[in-house]
């Protein structure tokens, strides 16, 4: 194991400017999470208002997740070319427009309540997902230039906790708003928060230390020592010709089925199976602990990866998949509400461990700062394509087989993901030799 002395010791000014950069970026992404997962809290309200079954609601979910997945794959190279800051601004303001448009769907009664209205909601939510797909690409692209490979695990944990704060807010706001206000406010409120964070991103975020007036430094990732020109050929070769990145992409497909199968449907499961209103104390407390577990999972994953596994990501992801398998078995058996809540909490922890390690960190490591967005697009895109099946597909399954089929449908995917991580257990990014130099912006410790 490498000694922690391999970590760079940055100047105070560098740390201050980087802090302003990643705090703004992280909370902007958290706001976008609110505008992505709010649909799960309007799921039952939409069904009750318009008389739709789970398969019809699932159509909206599938359209959105499919478009997100495909868009992330194709927008990754674009974000690598235009930079993360521009990509985030495109994403956040697009998401503002289409969250507002989804809420305004409450006032288009002339479409009726049948296929035309479903088509409207599915189209608008798919467009929201297109712009949402820029968010992860932008986040990883910017951070890949600001964080050394030996810092990324822990800082990905910090980012993971910030992102989960957006999820926590929509758990609280969504649950209360859908009960006290018309359902459309579950979309209007996140739109307003995203707009504020978009303007802060414009003001504070910069793509690299150099753009913020700081000296550059060697991040020691897959781009280290790489002087090739960044073009489409370079990006595709860097990511698609790498067996490690393609194996991670396959694992992320499995992650998507489990993650979205859980996150898109668990509020409705609690309402219909456990008979808990979204505003109830038990649901609110349980949802809070689920989010807290996600935050804890990101911290456990980042710390274990950097300090126990020498900045290797697959071993930690394997543990996350194993946790998911155990928890989904408990959900399948459904021994009682306390057990179900406990399984939800640990499942959230396991999902967060995998997500922060693969989409959040391995993409920077194996894509390098030059191709980080392309790698993220591939990983995140495959995750959402895998998740697309939990929309209409899961809706059909639940309509025909009931909630007893929910847990078992996700177990096999978690198992395949765990086996793929065993295959990559010792994988680390390859580096090109670079000229010996003292990294600018890094204050070396005195000998």
Language-model regions, residue ranges each:
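Juxtamembrane intracellular "pre-TM" segments in multi-pass secondary transporters
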Residues: 2-15, 208-248, 438-447
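C-terminal transmembrane helical hairpin of 12-TM major facilitator-type secondary transporters
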Residues: 311-361
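Cytoplasmic helix-loop-helix junction between adjacent transmembrane helices
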Residues: 124-165
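Helix-loop-helix hairpin linking two adjacent transmembrane segments in secondary transporters
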Residues: 159-210
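Cytoplasmic membrane-interface "Motif A"-like loop-to-helix N-cap segments
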Residues: 81-92, 306-321
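Extracytoplasmic gate region of multi-pass secondary transporters
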Residues: 39-43, 242-299, 355, 359, ...
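C-terminal ends and interior cores of transmembrane alpha-helices
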Residues: 93-114, 322-335
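Residue-level signature of mid-helix packing/kink "hotspots" within the transmembrane helices
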Residues: 37, 65-73, 167-168, 291-299, ...
